[in-house]
UniProtKB/Swiss-Prot annotation:
Reactions mediated catalytically: a 2-demethylmenaquinol + S-adenosyl-L-methionine = a menaquinol + S-adenosyl-L-homocysteine + H(+); a 2-methoxy-6-(all-trans-polyprenyl)benzene-1,4-diol + S-adenosyl-L-methionine = a 5-methoxy-2-methyl-3-(all-trans-polyprenyl)benzene-1,4-diol + S-adenosyl-L-homocysteine + H(+)
Protein family (similarity comment): Belongs to the class I-like SAM-binding methyltransferase superfamily. MenG/UbiE family.
Disulfide-bonded cysteines: none
One GO BP annotation of this record: menaquinone biosynthetic process
Functional pathway: Quinol/quinone metabolism; menaquinone biosynthesis; menaquinol from 1,4-dihydroxy-2-naphthoate: step 2/2; Cofactor biosynthesis; ubiquinone biosynthesis
Protein role: Methyltransferase required for the conversion of demethylmenaquinol (DMKH2) to menaquinol (MKH2) and the conversion of 2-polyprenyl-6-methoxy-1,4-benzoquinol (DDMQH2) to 2-polyprenyl-3-methyl-6-methoxy-1,4-benzoquinol (DMQH2).
Binding site for S-adenosyl-L-methionine: T72, D93, D121, A122
The protein, known as: Ubiquinone/menaquinone biosynthesis C-methyltransferase UbiE
InterPro entries cross-referenced by the UniProt entry: SAM-dependent_MTases_sf, UbiE/COQ5_MeTrFase, UbiE/COQ5_MeTrFase_CS
Source organism (scientific name): Teredinibacter turnerae (strain ATCC 39867 / T7901)
Length: 249
């Protein structure tokens, strides 16, 4: 396999063309129990990580927001309240199973007029240039085949001065925490997946994909290379998760 045509699916080296299909299989499998597993895996702490993301977004009434890899709609729901009737939030996800769960959940909660849905690949965003005031991608970038291409696409569809926020698992900043986290990720997570979703393999992939994702400083550099300015990151829970923020010049 040529290095130019390969990428990582967890620890496995695969053809770049095959990764999206394999990631899709993971999320088709876990979509129905995705919210439950998030609560169980993180002890509910993911809600605090997302709350901080919302607070840092600077989203105001009337803004247009794109929630990439928006899945079951946690961030979309909060943004929809912030932008109000004059604003718009687009929940985008490449996976139709996740998108359906998110749409059903938000409709049940009464989010109708200011939320739209798009099945979209982060690398090939189907929106005009300079469309959005803010873009978020939460726990989705590590699953993208070509992260540099996706970051460039996000820069393209942001308005000048618009903000990108990337919430993602990252590298723990303490060696003891890192060892404990690896033990949890590679042993406990797959066991939880098997018990709750009858799917240990998908959560084994989750652990591997986290390990293979760029660390905080590397991702900051990738955002800068994609054209973002004022890039910085905020470590949460000891660096297990990091929130990166950049602005379109």
């Amino acid at each position: 396999m040529s290095d130019e045509n390969t990428t990582h699916f967890g620890f496995e080296t695969v053809n770049a063309a095959d990764k999206a299909e394999r990631v899709a299989g993971v999320f088709h499998s876990v979509a129905a129990k995705y919210d439950l597993m998030n609560d169980v895996m993180s002890g509910g702490i993911h809600r605090l990580w997302k709350k901080f993301t919302i607070e840092l977004s600077g989203v105001r009434p009337g803004d247009r927001v794109l929630d990439i890899a928006g899945g079951t709609g946690d961030l979309t729901a909060k943004f929809a309240r912030l932008v109000g009737d004059e604003g718009q939030v687009v929940l985008a996800d490449i996976n139709d199973s996740m998108l359906k769960v998110g749409r059903d959940k938000l409709v049940d909660k009464g989010f109708l007029g200011n939320v739209q849905y798009a099945q979209a690949d982060a690398q090939f965003l189907p929106f005009p240039d300079n469309t959005f005031d803010c873009i978020t991608i939460a726990f989705g970038l590590r699953n993208v085949t070509d992260k540099d291409m996706a970051l460039a696409a996000m820069n393209r569809v942001l308005k000048p001065g618009g903000r990108l926020l990337v919430l993602e698992f990252s590298k723990p900043q303490n060696s003891l925490l890192e060892k404990a986290y690896d033990l949890y990720s590679f042993n406990v997570l797959p066991m939880m997946g098997k018990l709750i979703t009858q799917d240990a393999d998908s959560y084994r992939y989750l652990a591997e994909s986290i390990r293979m994702h760029p660390d905080q400083q590397t991702l900051k550099g990738m955002m800068e290379n994609a054209g973002f300015a004022q890039c910085r990151y905020y470590n949460m829970t000891g660096g297990i998760v990091a929130l990166h923020k950049g602005t379109k010049a």
